[in-house]
Amino acid sequence: MTITKLAWRDLVPDTESYQELFAQPDLAKEHEFILSDTQPRLHYALEQALSPWATSPFMLLKAPEEAEYLTLLGDAMRQLRPEANAVFGGQYRIAGDKIAFEPADQADDRFAAKGEVITANWVEAEQLFGCLRQFNGEITLQPGLVHQANGGVLVISLRTLLAQPLLWMRLKAIVSHERFDWVAFDESRPLPVSVPPMPLKLKVILVGERESLADFQDMEPELAEQAIYSEFEDNLQIVDAETMTQWCQWVTHTATRNNLPYPAPDAWQVLIREAVRYTGEQDTLPLNPLWITRQFKEVAPLCEGETCNAEQFSLMLAQREWREGFLAERMQDEILQEQILIETEGERIGQINALSVIEFPGHPRAFGEPSRISCVVHIGDGEFTDIERKAELGGNIHAKGMMIMQAFLMSELQLEQQIPFSASLTFEQSYSEVDGDSASMAELCALISALADVPVNQSIAITGSVDQFGRAQPVGGL
């Protein structure tokens, strides 16, 4: 067995190597093509979608269906798209009950467009396709988002189309035929007059989460196969000063575009520590604009200028932890008052402390808690009893970890006959479902302690999963 002792610096992100970088004034500058640095795959896909040789007028993008993401995509498309000199669409001449369509002479015609990029989160039929209104015998035609995006790009949330299938069927027909036909939204109430169709050409970017994209693929398998696909990457792997610079510029850009203060040189270390808590990995930092914006919105009241320093960030994080910390404090009180029994001194046979990640539904913060695992061994037929599983409190992944641990022990003992003992393991004072395999190393140690009749030091806690060869594996959330 190899034992490697970790210093406290091994458990925190490396920020000392980038102190000179944090002090550079370039981090506060606006960078025109910030998306190409942090989202190169997405940037390339958008270029492909805008190309006249694109394989499909539709693009599927995996990203949260939030206004902030749609706005970011819209801004990126406007940067990539050359300014259009042509005018698309036209205008309708209405004389009594006669309506005629004429190509646009100028951009301010009612149904004229200049190839703009339009974003939409949730829309209804009238917002998307426009409508015909009649009042006191006078007819007016109202343009919709598709008319405003004529010659350009429509960025729309996928869930609004999945929830309203008729909207999708009509939008698909418009884009495929490059023509807009006026039809009644209610079949029982036809249009009072006939309205001539108009040419309409646009590209559509459908933005959705993984589940929405899966539902769309089931509904439109052929279109999903032909459409350009890309993803908004949630995080950035930090491997050198260049990637750290890209992340810092992304954070600064996100803050300034929302008119929020951005980090001062000494604040980056505090922000990065909070960022790795969010991602769960030391070398991975989030690109989620909602998370970034939240940090600066909360610290903004404490800032006096256009930047926020380390002291202000630390104060904001301490206030947030206190505000959200009621449940964590109550759990700690239960241990201190010995309502939950956790031994931190001495030695015990068949008992060990593990670490659990507690998540309460509706609570924004996950927190750690020590868990007491016990193992009892007795003469038997080789059965390993997982009490959590027997009581239907153990999940499938936890059961898998138990079976892997059992397989390792069988292989290690190399007995020529059936094991002459049975063992039972449990999480003591656990009254809710337990899942995950990150306790399998602690369970294995408790089992070996009980088998060998060797006590375990109770001042330590163990976490980590184990494979069939007995090797410790990394776990998240630390």
Where are the language model's segments positioned?
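Conserved ASCE/P-loop NTPase catalytic core
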Residues: 1-217, 228-240, 248-370, 384-394
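Flexible glycine/proline-rich, aromatic-decorated loop/lid segments
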Residues: 220-226
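Terminal-proximal interaction/regulatory segments of ATP-powered molecular machines
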Residues: 358-478
